[in-house]
Amino acid sequence: KVCIVFEGRDTAGKGGTIAAITGKLNPRQVRVVALPKPDPRERTQWYFQRYIAHLPAAGELVLFDRSWYNRAGVEKVMGFCSPEEYENFLRETPYFERSLGDSGILLLKYWLAVDQAEQEARFAERANDPLKRWKLSPIDLVAREKYRDYGKARDTMFEATHRPGAPWVV
């Protein structure tokens, strides 16, 4: 049971990295999870609940293209969660991840980094390429102005959730 979390700024290459990995593996034992924003029912649940159904069973590899760490990044920076929800997330995540390990799930967490100049170049490429334009969202355009805020949120997330058994790999 292997669960790999890919996180990083927009345009960091999460989707491309996942495609490169899964292209060489047996699709019967590999799943990619990229959840949309929570629906009204999911917003009433325990925060981690919507992710649990997607965790791997024996013999499976699950790759998350973004994950529960949305709360520490986009939700925090864009104001989609309350300060209390954010603090609860930072406090609860190490316990949640420890329980995954205790149940036999190997959790690997990767942060893909891209600097601001490269991110801007990739945003421009997406905007100008009809085959990539679908990747741009209104949130992406607002988030571009919050590059430093995302960096601070990332650093706080690393400090709260980097631990033996589930370290971040940058």
Predicted segment positions?
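Pre-Walker A (Motif I) flank of P-loop NTPase domains
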Residues: K1-I4, G59, A166-P167
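A structural signal for short, well-ordered beta-strand segments and their strand-loop junctions
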Residues: V5, V62-D65, L107-W111, V170
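Glycine-rich phosphate-binding P-loop
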Residues: V5-T22
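Conserved nucleotide-binding/hydrolysis micro-motifs of P-loop NTPases
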Residues: T11, P38-R41, S67-N70, A113-E120, ...
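Conserved nucleotide-sensing/catalytic segment adjacent to the nucleotide-binding pocket
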Residues: R28-R91
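Glycine-rich ThDP/TPP pyrophosphate-binding loop and its adjacent helix/strand module
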Residues: S99, E145, G151, E159-P167
